[in-house]
Design a protein with these regions (language model features):
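Bacterial N-terminal signal peptides
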Residues: 10-20
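Mature N-terminal segment immediately following signal peptide/propeptide cleavage
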Residues: 28-57
Length: 436
């Protein structure tokens, strides 16, 4: 069997898996409705299981924060679950459990989220609960200190762990003054200043109908969901008071940072600025990242770990962003091997710029990438999340299908082209017990 034939079969298998995982979990494509007040509703009818999931995204996150309030979005999301005008924190939790599901909240760079699940027969009460938390949180002052302490503890913990510390450092260096360079947990000094009134003002600024995306997936009908959501969110403010932030440009620059810290494993991270999700090069960079660092068959694993024995762990990542993206590779190694491991990893980054990936490598990367994507979209909770996520990133909920087709169309020449375009100005961070 030729390499081209094997490549075609591998991609076909991955697309079949993608279809089974996503198609079997969804009886319809998401139906998009924009209410008169500006709120966006995405409904995916799926009668395969008697479960309903809702993901409420609001365009609020670290991208809209400054050094003075860094971490406020994550803090707000946690405190919102501590009580509303009609429910205490215990009643929120008990209501969610009584519906046969749960509720949680979090913040990220480009969005913040309230997510909840329930048995399908309880979907209206589920919407009641989500709307209550989103629109009527009391943000009790007595709960703020506890959540703040938890975030400060998590920040200190990241400073004590080699990989999180190295990752936070490389993000800060590659992004410079851009808000993506700050941890989602924020800055300790900023968190100490945030009080009840500050959280109330932040909530009022961002939780407005034009900034809200509500995705619902499950055994429901779109017409009924739209009507019920419109009724529950009728009181949401229609004014847009938080325009897109004026962000400094993230400019590619060669940079090297050495962190000296006691650690059983040395860390080496190499990062590059990369295109946002909406960019035409996004699928090709995803394939590039997978060919290098995706799973046990990626070049970094096979060449640096298996063949040369220079790493305990290694991989690559290219997170999806609305703004400038980042692609990074990472390895953990014995401190004595740090210098050689870094040379080996940089060598693989150089080789993928010089040499096209083989047909089998290309097929494996596509199969792994599409297979993992399909497997991650098997539940209503993940379907709702992806629908809201892609809408928040500005590519629309139908991006999942377009993305699969775009990945299938990526060629070896595309992979080499984006490698030569984006893997040119490395930001390197090393961490170990002594300068290596």
């Amino acid at each position: 069997m030729t390499g081209r034939r094997r490549a075609a079969l591998a991609v076909a298998a991955a697309l079949t898996l993608l279809g089974v995982a996503a198609g079997a979990a969804s009886a319809s494509e998401p139906q998009r409705t924009r209410l008169a007040n500006g709120l966006t509703i995405l409904v995916r009818e799926n009668a395969a299981t008697p479960v309903v999931a809702a993901s409420l995204f609001v365009r609020m996150g670290s991208r809209w924060e400054t050094e003075d309030n860094a971490g406020i979005s994550h803090l707000l999301q946690q405190v919102m679950l501590k009580g509303t005008a009609t429910r205490s924190a215990l009643e929120i939790a008990e209501t969610a459990e009584g519906l046969g599901g749960g509720i949680s909240a979090s913040a990220d760079m480009d969005y913040s989220e309230i997510r909840a699940t329930a048995l399908a027969r309880n979907w209206k009460t589920l919407l009641d609960l989500v709307a209550d938390v989103a629109l009527r949180p009391t943000l009790p002052a007595a709960e703020i200190d506890g959540e703040r302490r938890a975030m400060l503890t998590a920040l200190r913990s990241r400073q004590d762990q080699p990989f999180p510390l190295a990752l936070d450092t490389v993000m800060s260096r590659v992004y410079g003054d851009h808000p993506y360079g700050r941890p989602i947990l924020g800055r300790a000094a900023a968190l100490e200043r945030i009080d009840h009134d500050t959280l109330v003002a932040h909530h009022r600024r961002f939780y407005r109908a034009p900034r809200i995306i509500l995705a619902v997936s499950g055994d429901i009908t779109a017409r009924e969901v739209v009507a019920e959501v419109a009724r529950r969110f009728a009181g949401a403010s229609t004014e847009e008071s938080a325009p897109e932030p004026l962000e400094p440009s993230a400019a590619a620059r060669a940079d090297r940072t050495v962190l000296v810290k006691p650690a059983a494993q040395a860390q080496v991270l190499v990062a590059f600025l990369a295109p946002p999700t909406a960019h035409p090069d996004y699928p090709a960079v995803k394939v590039l990242a997978t060919a290098l660092g995706g799973g046990m068959a990626g070049r970094l694993f096979t060449e640096v770990r298996d063949k040369q024995g220079l790493a305990y762990s290694t991989g690559g990542s290219y997170p999806s962003r609305r703004g400038p993206g980042v692609f990074y590779t990472q390895l953990g190694t014995a401190p004595a091997n740090q210098a050689r491991a870094e040379v080996a990893m940089l060598g693989e980054l150089d080789r993928i710029r010089r040499e096209p990936v083989s047909p089998s490598e290309l097929a494996r990367a596509k199969a792994y990438l599409l297979g993992q994507f399909g497997l991650d979209r098997r539940t209503n909770a993940r379907l709702a999340w992806y629908d809201a996520f892609f809408e928040a990133l500005g590519v629309g909920p139908d991006f999942a299908d377009r993305y699969a087709q775009a990945v299938e169309a990526v060629t070896a020449e595309d992979v080499q082209r984006v490698a030569r375009t984006y893997l040119t100005t490395p930001t390197i961070v090393t961490l170990g017990p002594a300068a290596q």
